[in-house]
UniProtKB/Swiss-Prot annotation:
ATP binds at T65, V66, G67, G68, T69, G70, K71, T72. NCBIfam families: lpxK. Keywords: ATP-binding, Kinase, Lipid A biosynthesis, Lipid biosynthesis, Lipid metabolism, Nucleotide-binding, Transferase. This is Tetraacyldisaccharide 4'-kinase. Pathway: Glycolipid biosynthesis; lipid IV(A) biosynthesis; lipid IV(A) from (3R)-3-hydroxytetradecanoyl-[acyl-carrier-protein] and UDP-N-acetyl-alpha-D-glucosamine: step 6/6. It catalyses: a lipid A disaccharide + ATP = a lipid IVA + ADP + H(+).
Amino acid sequence: MAAPQHTLADFVTDQWQRRSWFTWLMWPLSLLFGLIARIRRYGYQQGWFKSTRLPMPVIVVGNVTVGGTGKTPAVIALAHALAEAGLRPGVVSRGYGVKLNHPRRVKPTSKAADVGDEPLLIARAADVPVWVFPDRALCTQAMLVSHPGVNVLLLDDGLQHYKLQRDFEIVMFDTRMGGNGMMLPAGPLREPLTRPRDATLINDPNFRATPDKPDVYGMRLELDEAWQLNDPTMSCDVSKFADKRVLAAAGIGHPERFFASLRQAGLSPATLPLPDHYDFVQDPFADNPAALEADVILITEKDAVKCERFDDPRIWVVPTTPVIDAGLIDKIRRVVQARNPAIATPVTVGQSTATGMADGLDKEHQDGQPAA
């Protein structure tokens, strides 16, 4: 089966980067969306809706825009940094595209179809507990049953998940920033660009911090040695493929970011952008002309966790190492150290509580079983 066509999604994404007839056609709906978003956030701030305070500092990494900005590598980098600082971080994620009836532990041996591709990548890249469930407060409390030593939480893509109170919010952007600056559906914004946050993290190798913006930090993704999907012991620098016919494929939020990094490494690949979270149930390379002619097919780590069944020695995985400005790491450490993590019981404000969740889980759900 050929790679899926997503012309409509491409069209809308393109329109979100400018102000055009589409922008103004959607503008009335954007006003309504923006009003609802503001009321919702204000309602949680005022305690109209339930929200849970967990017995540990909560660090949120998220977007005000639709689409990928590099949250997953940022979470991995922060997990490593917090662990190196002597803390015991845990990660909670929604588990995008996965049907879950209860909180589930993500193990390095889990399947992406059971827990989601990004949580699985985090579990394999960072030696920390990773759990998934749409109700992140419930999920965290389940994690604490199995991992009572966790003393700081990283909430992956949870900026708009106000059911869970937080101590530090990181809003991420990439080179597209806020697009045309308009709310959905006229633009890519889930919330206004002016939304308060503790830090802004920009995934851009050319970003440079300036003194006039002390809470804006940069992140870059450095390419590591590629490894062969069928035999991970085989590795080489991606520059070795410069004289090969290369196809680069990516099912991430912004595939062009991956393609551009390969060009910067000296490659001139044909490209195959796939929808974000593409499941690879159908082989996108089977009858793609560029794939059939390619000597080498390069994919991302996020896609690799879904391609393990492919028996094709041409497929190589290109990992990246996220590098975050040290100033952001230091600021997070200060926030974590300022809060006493030894709170015994979650405190809930608003209409109801998630306290007591752990008692409602049977033993096999508490320890993450059945294993995914």
